[in-house]
């Protein structure tokens, strides 16, 4: 069997140039939902997220951020071989919003997607 390695530095949300089931390993480190340094990236991809923040509906914002990531996971799943692995570097988010300390379990949202 011929083996080759290729590093692709691009968004995992569009892997249309990669055939289905052809990848054995995906390593990705997406923007973390509900971590302030990544807010603007999510706002740019879906302006409704900024509106959710303005309305202080942080749960809706969190869900919409994961909707964005889910598009990437769909593509990863499509290109992944049956015996392949996806390694996702992401952490949970802790954040004080208003006067409330919140935990946003990013790992759980991703696990739920893949189950």
Predicted regions and their residues:
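S-adenosyl-L-methionine-dependent nucleic acid methyltransferase catalytic domains
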Residues: 1-115
């Amino acid at each position: 069997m011929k083996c080759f390695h290729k590093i692709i530095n691009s968004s995992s949300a569009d892997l249309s140039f990669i055939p289905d089931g052809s990848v054995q390993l995906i390593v990705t480190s997406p923007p973390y939902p509900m971590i302030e340094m990544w807010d603007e990236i999510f706002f740019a991809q879906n302006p409704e997220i900024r509106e959710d923040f303005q309305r202080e509906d942080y749960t809706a914002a969190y869900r919409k951020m994961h909707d964005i990531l889910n598009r990437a996971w769909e593509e990863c799943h499509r290109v992944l071989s049956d015996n392949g692995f996806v390694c996702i570097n992401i952490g949970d988010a802790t954040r004080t919003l208003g006067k409330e300390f919140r935990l946003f379990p990013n790992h759980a949202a991703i696990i739920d997607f893949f189950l």
